[in-house]
């Protein structure tokens, strides 16, 4: 009997199978957005057991466990690694039709050569065999086995870049770059947290922040530092874009008030964010960076568990914020002075798919293929159905052939199977259309496009320095 995970998993036509095995499968991975801990890359971390590498930091799995009636101590609490593993294994059969069922079986198959269905009967065997394999596996082995050419971590301007500097000297083929994510620079509505962050920023920039000009200079210095170490991407996670009129004088007054401990009003927070986002856009454009906008998350919905566990532990959801008008004004303001950088737009609400897919077309300027990108399905949308929605919207309103493809957006080193999952979904979608006669059943036409979406488009678009073996 064929195992659940097999060579042709998710590939339902001959054309899909040919596209995947001949054009997609062997391509390297360009992971241009993730949340991997660079400390574990630096130290070439060896994971103690399957629970650490499989469950640690994975809020997708924690949400499913809670939904299955699992107590918090088995998710993020003090239960033993084996107890946490057993709690997850008990939950997996209940995740049928959830992408976690696919992902979890792919992870065991690809990293550990385990093809058993995950359940309580197979738990002892999985635990034993995976831990035996982990004893011979370190982070660098995982990166090499998956042919990971690039990792772009997510970094605050106040974070030290020391680990990135050390990783650069390791000599591994995977290049690791920081991504400039200045979300906390906008937080003038919470003066205590804001001022504590400003002190950290001042330390990272090796300067004092006594004025608004000092603040801008410190941020600009950190932007320069990220560039010097090879970073070429920025990222912003916001409920929606901001495009309110705001002069430098108004922004300075809002900053000064927050520095003095007075919280900005909601209206002033929007004005300040609007001013700063334009500054960030201009800096990115001047240096030839790519800006990423992650829009639409409603975060930290459970205040009780936020207070107990902190953010990014599985209590966020899709928001229904108005997106298009402010986004249009923001992009247009930068474009009107020829200061719009390459931009990747990600929406979390699938209702915005066609709005975002059409928005990028307004600002393609012919300077580079696919300057404006509609990003791959993000977070709650990085599963088969929603990835198809995103690719269909992009295909119908733009050029799928110029798409920069998949990213992990993950905190787990096992998540490189997400690229395989995406590639299989891509090939199945296109292969079905080839066999229905909706596009030519011509592998010499379609195959190279698939290959480019899997790696080369991202390599050419982001223009990061790669190891010679990945330069093509």
UniProtKB/Swiss-Prot annotation:
Top enzyme class: isomerase
Pathway as given in its UniProt record: Carbohydrate metabolism; pentose and glucuronate interconversion
Biological-process GO terms, alphabetical: D-galacturonate catabolic process; D-glucuronate catabolic process
InterPro entries from the UniProt entry: Metal_Hydrolase, Uronate_isomerase
Origin: domain of life: Bacteria
Keyword Repeat set for record: no
Gene Ontology molecular-function annotations: glucuronate isomerase activity
Pfam families reported in the protein's UniProt record: UxaC (PF02614)
Repressor is among the record's keywords: no
Catalytic activity: D-glucuronate = D-fructuronate; aldehydo-D-galacturonate = keto-D-tagaturonate
Keywords, comma-separated and alphabetical: Isomerase
Enzyme Commission no: 5.3.1.12
Family: Belongs to the metallo-dependent hydrolases superfamily. Uronate isomerase family.
Entries under NCBIfam families matching the protein: PRK02925.1
HAMAP family in the record: UxaC (MF_00675)
Protein name per Swiss-Prot or TrEMBL: Uronate isomerase
Gene that encodes the chain: uxaC
